[in-house]
Amino acid sequence: MLALIVLCFILFFYIISRRHRGLCYPPGPTPLPIVGNLLSVLWESRKFKCHHLIWQSWSQKYGNLLGLRLGSINVVVVTGIELIREVSNREVFEGRPDGFFYTMRSFGKKLGLVFSDGPTWHRTRRFVLKYLKNFGYNSRFMNVYIGDECEALVQLRLADAGEPILVNQMFHITIVNILWRLVAGKRYDLEDQRLKELCSLVMRLFKLVDMSGGFLNFLPFLRHFVPRLIGFTELQEIHNALHQYLREIIKEHQENLQLGAPKDVIDAFLIDMLESQDDKPTLDDLQVVCLDLLEAGMETVTNTAVFMLLHVVRNEDVQRKLHQEIDDIIGRDRNPLLDDRIRMVYTEAVILETLRISTVASMGIPHMALNDAKLGNYIIPKGTFILLSLYELHHGPHWKDPETFRPERFLTKEGNILQDEWLIPFGIGKRRCIGEGLARSELFMFLTHILQKFHLRIPKNEPLPSTEPIDGLSLSAKQFRIIFEPRKTFKSI
């Protein structure tokens, strides 16, 4: 009798699930009752080490719109420049998923810059951009902020010159300092132990799950039965530690707040909370915005910068050309400036090629359909999570030799930068990453400061570092070491 009841329940769930998907839902592997395609994902993960490769494999079989059912949630994977552009530019697809994994970090609500939508997102984005610009974001002050941190990083590498250095965590505090001067009016020593621990927490967080959200999104009830197995316990511990740190920073600002004289973004937020009558932010808003800036700003740029050094050290001819351009345009007697960027086309091409071949945001940040909507020849139901296959876009046949690191693909015959519309590592449309300008500036300054002063090489008897990424919210490089050798004619700063 019990077996019959269970069977009826499963059948009922399956029928409801099929009805919710609709007859015009994009094709994909057949889902099972309750778990949907999750078991298929687990099976395929034995073959493919990264989730974006699973989606790519299925898309090749089912088409540019891949329809999945993961647990109780519809998920559509979008492949191809035209469909990606359409999803990115249509208002109906501007939503962000409301899965448990995305909201557990923001007090069960859709707050902040990354995972909010609708009026909350528009309000928060407007506030944050206004505050950041007021304190120097995208202004001449960024030359100073980024330059200071690059000089500190160079000095640290000069102190251990000739020694093999694990580079995977090298940029974390540097990146935090650049943004945190605007956000919290604070900078840290590059050897600050507490911030190193917080950076390690963010690294762990980004490796726990891919951008789809995993079992915590699709079968969230499992956290009550096997919390450690599905990563809930570790995620909760990490978020608790990060929120505790942010609460301390905000409390310190509250205690020293001077109305009418904000010193940084947090001060401006707090003053707005006190003085605004309508549509004012809350402490929860502020805390999640700080979390977004800390996590996304740190980990994605760090991973890209590490991949950038990886490709340079693997390709000696690329390193030689970078040294030559730096010597010709900047020389050795002054530090690089952001103003140099417009003339340094080969350096820019190396950055673009890194963003292409090592697309750390392999599926972008998920979108969600705010209403039923037609896409291609199919209907995307309201509430569907939408993943944009950026990694596949950057590794498709358009590039002819996509697995080869070749910066020259971004140079015209005349030696100018070629802007290829197929390269969209920061997304497009209204939900395009607001930190794109800062990220590109940081990558330029990191590369020029380091290559002006050092020749990079792999330690003796160690293999070339692998270009194969580690899966996660942001793809990251496997651990590798570099020796930073001061260039022979380098003059100390």
Swiss-Prot record:
Disruption phenotype: Larvae undergo precocious metamorphosis in the third (dimolter) or fourth instar (trimolter). constitutively expressed in corpora allata from the first instar larval to adult stages. Its cofactor is heme. One of its GO terms (cellular component) is cytoplasm. Keywords: Heme, Iron, Metal-binding, Monooxygenase, Oxidoreductase, Signal. CDD domains: CYP15A1-like. PROSITE patterns: CYTOCHROME_P450. It catalyses: (2E,6E)-farnesoate + reduced [NADPH--hemoprotein reductase] + O2 = juvenile hormone III carboxylate + oxidized [NADPH--hemoprotein reductase] + H2O + H(+). Residues 1-24 form the signal peptide. GO terms for biological process: juvenile hormone biosynthetic process; metamorphosis; organic acid metabolic process; xenobiotic metabolic process. Heme binds at C433. It comes from the Eukaryota. Its EC number is 1.14.14.128. GO terms for molecular function: farnesoate epoxidase activity; heme binding; iron ion binding; oxidoreductase activity, acting on paired donors, with incorporation or reduction of molecular oxygen, NAD(P)H as one donor, and incorporation of one atom of oxygen; steroid hydroxylase activity. It is an enzyme of class 1 (oxidoreductase). Catalyzes the conversion of farnesoate to juvenile hormone III acid in juvenile hormone biosynthesis. Belongs to the cytochrome P450 family. The enzyme is specifically found in lepidoptera (moths and butterflies) and is specific for farnesoate. Other insects contain the methyl farnesoate epoxidase, which is specific for methyl farnesoate. This is Farnesoate epoxidase. It comes from Bombyx mori.
